Structure formats: C-alpha cells, structure tokens
UniProtKB/Swiss-Prot annotation:
The lineage of its organism: Eukaryota, Metazoa, Chordata, Craniata, Vertebrata. Expressed in brain, muscle and lung. This is Tyrosine-protein phosphatase non-receptor type 11. Residues 247-517 form the Tyrosine-protein phosphatase domain. The modification Phosphotyrosine is found at Y62, Y66, Y542, Y580. It comes from Rattus norvegicus.
Length: 593
C-alpha cells in the first residue's frame, strides 16, 4: 500500500458519514480514532448509499476487529481486508467490501512533509540525499494520527559524510488539533512547530543538537492537492542570494540526475546510421530502441530507427503485468527515414500516431510529410499508405490512414494520426485545456482498438514536446486508474521515461506545464465529481465537462473514474524496535547559533 492517508485523525462519526456520502462511492472507506474508546479506532465504510461503522481494537500488542485476524499495524489490518474480499462480514453474513480509500488531506502543503514514509526509508533518504541538518516530517506508522520529525545529525563540524552522522527521529503528537513533541509549547500547525524548532533547536540529553538547517523536500504529492503544491513551487525565493526555488529548483535537481542515465547508444553512433539521425547527438538508448526485424539480412543497419519504447512502470510494479498502454518516442521523419517509420508502425501494430510539431517552424524543417494527401495513396518502400479522410478540430487535425504491405492490400490496418497544430514555436501553450482535450481524444481512440500496439509520439527531436505529452498522459492514466486522491510524482515520472529515452522533457517551461496540465485535469475532474453528486441527488443524468472552453468536434469524455485507488501495493513496516528519541530526553536550547 503506497499511502495511508485513508486515516483521518480529527473527524467524528457524523463528519465521517458526511465525507463518505458527499465525496465517496459505495465501497469507499476511511479510518479514524474512536471517540467512545480512546486509543481504539473506527473503520467507516459506505455501502448501498449508507455508512457502516466497524470498531477496531488496539490492545497495545496488536490490532483486530474484536476477534478474528490480528495485525501489528493499523495499515496491515486495512490492507488485509482490502485484499481479502469476503473476509469482512456483518453478523447476518453480509459482506463489507473495502474498495476505495477516501484519503485525508495532507496536514500541510510544505514540501518537507513526506506523508507515508517508514523510518528506514527516511533514514535512507536523509543518508543518501541529505547532509548535516537536513530534516523531513512524515506520518507515524506506529501511532496513527501522529507524525515524526526525522533529522540528520553529525559531528560539530557538520561534515555530511562523517561516519558519526546518524538520523534522529522525534515523535510529534497531534492532540485536539494541536501539535507538540511530548512537552513544552503546543502549536496550531506542523509548519508552526517546524519553524519554531528551526529557530530554537532541541538538544538530546547526550548533547546532540537537532539543527533543522535545510528541508529534504519531497516531490510526491496527493493529486487532489496539486493546487497547493503548485502554489508552493510558485513562491519567490525568500532571499536574493537564494537563487534555487520552486519549479526551477526541482527541475535543476532533476537535471543533475542525468549522469545516472548514461546508457549506451552505440547503434545510433554507427557511421552507417548517422544520416538517419535528425540531430547527431540525440540518439536512442540501445536497451530500449525499436529494432526493425524485416530489413535486408545482408544490410546489418537496416534494423535501425531513432526511436525508443517507453513503458510506464506504475502498473507493472503494482500489478506485475504488462502495462495497458506503452509508447514509442521518436524523432520527426527525415526524407530518408520515412520508409523505416512506416515499417516500425506496421511491425509494432501501432494504431495511433501523435504528431506535436508543424512540418516547418521558424523557417526550419521539423518533420517531413510522411503521409499522402487526402484521398491519395502512396508507397513508402515496402509499405503502402492511403489517406482516407482528414478532419480539423480546434487544435489538431485527425487523419484516418490505411496501412498495408505492398502487394497485401486486402490486409489494411487503420492508423489514426493526431496532428497537434497549436503548440507555439517558442515556449509552451498558455492554456493546458487544449492539450488535455487532445490527449483525451487520443486516449479514447487507443482504448477503442483491441490489441493496439504502442502509441507513437514524435515532435522534431523526439524528446521535448514528445516527453511532455507522454509524461502528462502517464500521470493522467495513473489518476484514471487510482482516483483523484492517489499519489503522483512528476520528477520521478520524468526520471522513469528518461531512463528509456535520453533528455525527455527539455525545459523548465515544459516541466512547469506538466504541473499546470495535471492541475487543470484535477480541477476539471473534481467539478465533474461534484456535478455527478448533484445530479444523483436530483435524479438527473450527469453532463460531461470539457477541459477547455472550446467546443470539440468529436468524442464524449471518458467515464468518471473511482474517486479513490483500488490496487494495494506492498508497504514497508516500521521497525517496532526503533527507538524514538523524543523531547522527554531533550531540553530546548533557545540561543543556539
């Protein structure tokens, strides 16, 4: 399980019912502290339009439902009953299903809050990426509803690589909507608490000073709260000497990871293949390149095209199965690579092509025309393409093409080319709505074709706009699959696609645009959820909402996804033997410098 924000630490039973009935669907659930038995918990589940409350006992040794299976943590109990449908029943035998976790909002939008992170994971992060004084805040796994401040400490010199460096964990209690570290002053928010101890460091009884010098920021966010993260990333630097801030800081950190992705590109560097590359240094990784199998066996370089397979990893990790959708990221065709392009499309059984560039921009060729005129037929080497029809939407042109091998015209395949025409020559679109509507149409088409191969995406170099479109589409697919309350990680997703094709997402503007597009998608989706709830209450049929104000010429919106995630993934348990060095063992040093 990748998140435990189904736990709501500060709500009553009435508030839980209201949340589940207004934001949830049948099968939605949450956990909360028991008001009648302090220390115990309650599982609230929506079923048949009503809410059932189930008591969870915390004996101090284990968690259970007053009988039955016993668990070390609340998270393990919830995960077990999510995975084992039919195990949770009422006295009359009716099954209670836990399908969709209804997540609680993060207690803060600060980037130092890492949410569901174990102690071991925090130590690994702080050791590998932090330095003396680096800190983060996370949810407590042993005490649901509380939090933990994890700080990297070192010797007095603050040498980050010193063998004496360690990580200290301080429990943060949350009681009656106030936060404290087991004694002393209480604070209205986690942010107030952290700011206080940044100025007034805590000191262990052994003398170690817990200096909160610099936050170790997370890039993980709850998709539903992306507006708060965008607001944080958009803040100006606090001081003029602090250049790195927000989007620029995240993107620059991502750029510094490129040295970890120096995979071989020998095939693209071969002398015989150099004229097949639009840009001499933008080459495909060997381990993910598309290998053409139908070439001349006497011509070893006939298997080469500047293209890579991109496989989203979020599904394979959770489901151990082949992803529903994959991509081919490739460059814009050259005159001498058009034949190879169509060989690739045919070989991979690709049925959808996404073109994100004009043929010529600012007087420079970006992609040669690789399709025939409307109602015309043209042969490209061993492949034949027939342009059946073209239709123009506001931002793109849709072409219906028939592809076959020369001499095998009776085995034509339909290939749909979506040509996005309104990406500006400089920068990125001012409104992400047009891109989202475009990707929605592409998604519907791909979904409608049985056993369709990878979606082919290209611009000119096949990395900038191509990477931006693919990353946005992957993130939206995660939200479709897991719901608006799922976790997403923009830099991690970009790093994942960059491990399969070098340089995907080229500029800070493209990086920022990804955030803006996902934010726009979430806002629109939340409006649709609200409208659906209103319509259900009124008994009216639900009306779709478009991502942009421009009327589109084809396709309805996709069915509304569940509000919350379904597939549970394995989670790391907190080490029960881990000792919290809490403020009971510390004293406050107010004037430390």
């Amino acid at each position: 399980m990748t998140s435990r924000r189904w736990f709501h630490p500060n709500i009553t039973g009435v508030e839980a019912e209201n949340l589940l009935l207004t934001r949830g669907v049948d099968g939605s659930f949450l956990a909360r502290p028991s008001k009648s038995n302090p220390g115990d918990f309650t599982l609230s589940v929506r079923r048949n339009g009503a809410v059932t409350h189930i008591k969870i006992q915390n004996t101090g040794d284990y968690y259970d439902l007053y009988g039955g299976e016993k668990f070390a943590t609340l998270a393990e109990l919830v995960q077990y009953y999510m995975e084992h449908h039919g195990q949770l029943k009422e006295k009359n035998g009716d099954v209670i299903e836990l399908k969709y976790p209804l997540n609680c909002a993060d207690p803060t939008s600060e980037r130092w809050f890492h949410g569901h992170l174990s102690g071991k994971e925090a130590e690994k992060l702080l050791t590998e990426k932090g330095k003396h004084g680096s800190f983060l805040v996370r949810e407590s796994q042993s005490h649901p509803g509380d939090f933990v401040l994890s700080v990297r400490t070192g010797d007095d010199k603050g040498e980050s690589n010193d063998s004496k460096s360690k990580v200290t964990h301080v429990m943060i209690r949350c009681q009656e909507l106030k936060y404290d570290v087991g004694g002393g002053e209480r604070f209205d928010s986690l942010t107030d608490l952290v700011e206080h101890y940044k100025k007034n460091p805590m000191v262990e009884t052994l003398g170690t000073v817990l200096q909160l010098k610099q936050p170790l920021n997370t890039t993980r966010i709850n998709a539903a709260e992306i507006e708060s993260r965008v607001r944080e990333l958009s803040k100006l630097a606090e001081t003029t000497d602090k250049v790195k801030q927000g989007f620029w800081e995240e993107f620059e950190t991502l750029q510094q990871q490129e040295c970890k992705l120096l995979y071989s590109r020998k095939e693209g560097q071969r002398q015989e293949n150099k004229n097949k590359n639009r840009y001499k240094n933008i080459l495909p990784f060997d381990h993910t390149r598309v290998v053409l199998h139908d070439g001349d066996p006497n011509e070893p370089v006939s298997d080469y095209i500047n293209a890579n397979i991109i496989m989203p990893e979020f599904e394979t990790k959770c489901n151990n199965s082949k992803p529903k959708k994959s991509y081919i990221a490739t460059q814009g065709c050259l005159q001498n690579t058009v034949n190879d392009f169509w060989r690739m499309v045919f070989q991979e059984n690709s049925r959808v092509i996404v073109m994100t560039t004009k043929e010529v921009e600012r007087g420079k060729s970006k992609c040669v025309k690789y399709w025939p005129d409307e109602c015309a037929l043209k042969e490209y080497g061993v492949m034949r393409v027939r342009n059946v029809r073209e239709s123009a939407a506001h931002d793109y042109t849709l072409r219906e093409l028939k592809l076959s091998k020369v001499g095998q015209g009776n085995t034509e395949r339909t290939v749909w080319q979506y040509h996005f025409r309104t990406w500006p020559d400089h920068g990125v679109p001012s409104d992400p709505g047009g891109v989202l509507d475009f990707l929605e149409e592409v998604h519907h088409k791909q979904e409608s074709i049985v056993d369709a191969g990878p979606v082919v995406v290209h611009c000119s170099a096949g990395i900038g706009r191509t990477g931006t479109f693919i990353v946005i589409d992957i993130l939206i697919d995660i939200i479709r699959e897991k719901g608006v309350d799922c976790d997403i990680d923009v830099p991690k997703t970009i790093q994942m696609v960059r491990s399969q094709r070098s340089g995907m997402v080229q500029t800070e503007a493209q990086y920022r645009f990804i955030y803006m597009a996902v934010q726009h998608y979430i806002e629109t989706l939340q409006r649709r959820i609200e409208e659906e709830q209103k319509s259900k209450r009124k008994g009216h049929e639900y009306t779709n909402i478009k991502y942009s104000l421009v009327d589109q010429t084809s396709g309805d919106q996709s069915p509304l996804p569940p509000c919350t995630p379904t597939p549970p993934c394995a989670e790391m348990r907190e080490d029960s033997a881990r000792v919290y060095e809490n403020v009971g063992l510390m004293q406050q040093q107010r004037s430390f410098r």
